[in-house]
Amino acid sequence: MLDKVKREVFFVARLLVVLYLSTLLLISYENVNYIAVGILSVYFLINVYVYFFSKPRILQLISPFLDIILVPAFVFFSKILYSIYALGVLISVYAWRKPVLAGIILLETYGLAFFYFSGHYLLMISHFILFLALFFTSYNFEYATVVGKERKRILKLKKNYHKLLKEFSNFEREKRMFSNLRKILKLLRESKEPKDYFEGLKREFNVKRISVIPVNEVEGEEVFDYDKGTLSVFVKLDRGYAKVVYELDPPFRLRDPVLIQALVEGAKLLSLYVEGFEESAEGKQVLVVG
């Protein structure tokens, strides 16, 4: 509702500016500048289109730029002294809503005042004072103070909200980790053989395939192959080492750090079932689940 009222206020202000400048053109019809007429026509037509027909927000953002470009251009090309006062309307309408734009228009007004009154310094200074007074009297300091406080409050709420989301995310992650640990410990308690244990891991964590391979050399604690969707975990046994290979489907599950941590911890518990393997079994799959 407030945005609609604001939009209507701006449109009426621009319409009054067009009517005022059109009246000045009619008064000076004998020496009319057609560039100024073209500028005013474009300004009017675009504002009407934006107000009545534009729904995309990008079109509504055009109007302020028209105010700070086309109206000062009209004042410059028309050579009509009284047209400079139309900028006072724009300064007034922007002063408490968008003070930065009002300041830009004020500076443009100063430049045009210098253009028109460069030979009459007191008259030029009086116009400087007039438009500056118009800016300050139109600026709502109470509104600006309230908006400033609300802005700080909103930024603080936004910061606290992001902090809360981060804490909630950490809580959910820890909850998943604890749940996975419970599943692994339950499987460890209920499984008597490595095969039963890894079948339980496959079922609980939806793993496509699990292989256990005796090795002599360790390439690292974990090795990822994102193309094949495999995770290799090297486990130290009492006699030698073993490599537990998980095949995940789809492969992007390798990007889940909580799942990977659970699979790594689950693989390391192989040492509780197996002391080691025969040398003849090196490099061969001694256990395949899936």
Curated annotation (Swiss-Prot):
Membrane topology value: Multi-pass membrane protein
GO CC annotation terms, alphabetical: plasma membrane
Ranges annotated as spanning the membrane: 10-27, 32-54, 69-91, 100-117, 121-143
Keywords: Cell membrane, Coiled coil, Membrane, Transmembrane, Transmembrane helix
Segments forming a coiled coil: 147-183
Localisation per UniProt entry: Cell membrane
Protein name: Uncharacterized protein aq_1842
Organism: Aquifex aeolicus (strain VF5)
